């Protein structure tokens, strides 16, 4: 069988994206973001995002085909993010993808957007080893997964009990007065600060709580501790050392993620850790994971920055996995699922 060619379409939040992947080769990757339209509101406004998807859908898909020097007839299947995400945004992408699939008589796969974040690493590092661990870190998800057989069997090893890592960063960013999105600002300032200047707690790593939740995450306490420290310094009339706050926060969160990921690798006898999600673009986290991986003898696979944030390549790559595994396409009338569980790879 020749390598499958899949058109991937993404519209879960504020990026409209389309890409074409053949096997493990990325042929095109087009992204249109409405982020600037949301910045004035301090977060994504679903109605604005949905309208932006409707406007960008056809141009993105058309450019992806042109860039790959293909027509829709050359594509073997279409994959589209069916969840999790904002319902209105998902509806635009899924409706458009269904129309294309019907018009071109192509099979369609409604895929799990979050699993796509780890699938995309194959474009850079090749196929998944069997029985590997995966760390997903994004604005809405922080989870450790056991990927026994991609894409057929994926289990959740640990997950966040409250705020995800990205949410923690966004909330602290607002506290420090950074514009939306705040994560990149914390990353940039953190590179110039002292990571040990401020004592930031490491949730669920010690005592009974740590023993009871060896692979779970909790970052709400981190956010609260940083907020209280900043407020106390402001009350005392002290200037806030923004770079140090950012560096200390990033170091704490990155250390927790790296420790628990390595513990999971040891427990499941895996010498490979797959990392994905928008938060994996954070420079401190990338450095910490690579450092821990070297110390533990674990091959840490983190995709290049442009493949960390939402894109069509990750959707197309997961679509390729499903086609190769012989998984049946989704029904033509499959629904969106804004709360799609991580154990469900496709609809």
Curated annotation (Swiss-Prot):
Q: Look up the record and name the cofactor or cofactors this protein needs.
A: Fe(2+)
Asked whether the keyword Cell inner membrane is assigned, the reply is no
Catalytic activity annotated for this protein?
Answer: L-threonylcarbamoyladenylate + adenosine(37) in tRNA = N(6)-L-threonylcarbamoyladenosine(37) in tRNA + AMP + H(+)
Annotated cofactor note: Binds 1 Fe(2+) ion per subunit.
Matching PANTHER family, A to Z?
A: TRNA N6-ADENOSINE THREONYLCARBAMOYLTRANSFERASE, TRNA N6-ADENOSINE THREONYLCARBAMOYLTRANSFERASE, MITOCHONDRIAL
Gene that this sequence comes from:
tsaD
Which residues are listed for Fe cation binding in this entry?
A: 113, 117, 310
Source superkingdom = Bacteria
EC number, UniProt record: 2.3.1.234
Question: How is this protein named in the record?
Answer: tRNA N6-adenosine threonylcarbamoyltransferase
The scientific name of the source species is Bifidobacterium longum (strain NCC 2705)
Per its UniProt record, what SUPFAM superfamilies does this chain match? Actin-like ATPase domain
GO BP annotation list: tRNA threonylcarbamoyladenosine modification
Residues engaged in binding substrate: 136-140, 170, 183, 187, 282
Q: What do the Gene Ontology cellular component annotations say?
A: cytoplasm
Gene3D superfamilies in UniProt: 3.30.420.40
């Amino acid at each position: 069988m020749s390598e499958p060619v899949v058109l991937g379409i993404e519209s879960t939040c504020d990026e409209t994206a389309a890409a074409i992947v053949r096997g493990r080769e990325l042929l095109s990757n087009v992204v249109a973001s409405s982020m600037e339209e949301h910045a004035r509101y301090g977060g994504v406004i679903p109605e604005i995002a949905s309208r932006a998807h409707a406007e960008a859908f056809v141009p993105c898909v058309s450019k992806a085909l042109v860039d790959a020097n293909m027509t829709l007839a050359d594509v073997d299947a279409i994959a589209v993010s069916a969840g999790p995400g904002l319902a209105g945004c998902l509806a635009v992408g899924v409706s458009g993808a269904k129309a294309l699939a019907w018009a071109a008589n192509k099979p369609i796969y409604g895929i799990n957007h979050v699993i796509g974040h780890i699938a995309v690493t194959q474009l850079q590092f090749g196929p998944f080893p069997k029985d590997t661990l995966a760390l997903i870190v994004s604005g809405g998800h922080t989870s450790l997964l056991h990927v026994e057989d991609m894409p057929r069997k994926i289990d959740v090893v640990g997950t966040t009990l409250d705020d995800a890592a990205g949410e923690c960063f966004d909330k602290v960013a607002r506290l420090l007065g950074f514009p939306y999105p705040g994560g990149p600002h914390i990353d940039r300032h953190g590179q110039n600060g002292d990571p040990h200047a401020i004592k930031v707690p490491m949730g669920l790593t010690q005592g009974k709580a740590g023993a009871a939740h060896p692979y779970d995450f909790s970052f709400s306490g981190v956010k609260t501790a940083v907020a209280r420290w900043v407020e106390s310094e402001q009350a005392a009339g002290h200037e806030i050392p923004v770079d140090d706050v950012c560096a200390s926060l990033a170091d704490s969160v990155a250390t927790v993620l790296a420790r628990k990921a390595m513990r999971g690798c040891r427990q499941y006898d895996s010498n490979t850790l797959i990392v994905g999600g928008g938060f994996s673009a954070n420079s401190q986290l990338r450095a910490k994971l690579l450092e821990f991986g070297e110390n533990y003898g674990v091959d840490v696979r983190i995709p290049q920055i442009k493949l960390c944030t939402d894109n069509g390549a990750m959707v197309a790559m997961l679509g390729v996995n499903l086609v190769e595994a012989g998984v049946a396409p989704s029904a033509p009338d499959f629904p969106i699922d804004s709360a799609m569980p991580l154990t469900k790879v496709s609809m």
